[in-house]
Amino acid sequence: MQRLCAYVLIHVLALAACSEASWKPGFQLQDASSGPGANRGKEPHELDRLGPASHHRRQLGLQGPPHLVADLAKKQGPWMEEEEEAYGWMDFGRRSAEEGDQRP
């Protein structure tokens, strides 16, 4: 009996996870047809009427892709430092040119 309950529970959870995207089809279609910049200039209460979007998705819709790309371009992560350390030894051509410029 416990095994049957476990199977039913797993099946219900899997079904709920697979059908999560299909329980809001109206908002998905409206969002796709409106385009990325269509929510620009709308009031927050108007955005609430459009559908149950997440806070993050609303921010992306209001901000627009060009701003998002610019913000991501400004950020530098720790991987930049790792690349400098890993490939710094291969940068001998630039370093020797800089050393040549410093000598009188």
Curated annotation (Swiss-Prot):
Modified sites of kind Phosphoserine: S96
Maturation and modification: Sulfation enhances proteolytic processing, and blocks peptide degradation. Levels of sulfation differ between proteolytically-cleaved gastrins. Thus, gastrin-6 is almost 73% sulfated, whereas the larger gastrins are less than 50% sulfated. Sulfation levels are also tissue-specific.
Stretches with biased composition (Basic and acidic residues): 40-49
GO molecular-function terms, A-Z: hormone activity
Keyword Signal: yes
Modified sites of kind Sulfotyrosine: Y87
Keywords: Amidation, Cleavage on pair of basic residues, Hormone, Phosphoprotein, Pyrrolidone carboxylic acid, Secreted, Signal, Sulfation
Annotated stretches, region: Disordered: 27-67
Residues excised as propeptide: 22-58, 96-104
First and last residue of the signal peptide: 1-21
Localization, UniProt: Secreted
InterPro entries associated with the record: GAST, Gastrin/CCK, Gastrin/cholecystokinin_CS
Phenylalanine amide carried by residues: F92
Record PTM Pyrrolidone carboxylic acid, positions in chain: Q59, Q76
Biological processes per GO annotation: G protein-coupled receptor signaling pathway; response to food
Similarity section: Belongs to the gastrin/cholecystokinin family.
Protein role: Gastrin stimulates the stomach mucosa to produce and secrete hydrochloric acid and the pancreas to secrete its digestive enzymes. It also stimulates smooth muscle contraction and increases blood circulation and water secretion in the stomach and intestine.
Protein name: Gastrin
Species per Swiss-Prot/TrEMBL record: Sus scrofa
